[in-house]
């Protein structure tokens, strides 16, 4: 897979991974989800239906930020059909 992907291409692959249950959560992501009161299920819902922003290269990999309402979930691809959530947060109003 050649990265960075366009937001629409990333969206399609992220949604497939979410539907197929091929989403892993880094320990940092789990901590951030808990801190902001976001469940794993809600994070997966964001991946299934959120808006994917353009990729950013951070810490040696391409990251894709997915947003829905006030929740942001950032993923990196392990493979074309498997993503890892690296962090997440709830935007403060």
Residue ranges and their predicted role:
Residues 1-93:
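Ribonuclease/tRNase effector modules and their secretory precursors
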């Amino acid at each position: 897979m050649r990265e960075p992907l366009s937001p629409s291409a990333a969206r399609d692959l992220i949604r497939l991974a979410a539907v197929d249950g091929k989403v892993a959560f880094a320990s940092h992501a789990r901590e951030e989800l808990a801190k902001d009161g976001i469940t794993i299920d809600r994070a997966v819902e964001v991946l299934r239906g959120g808006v994917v922003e353009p990729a950013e290269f951070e810490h040696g990999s391409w990251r894709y930020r997915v947003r829905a309402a006030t929740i942001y979930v950032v993923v990196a691809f392990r493979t074309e059909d498997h993503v890892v959530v690296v962090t997440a947060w709830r935007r403060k109003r």
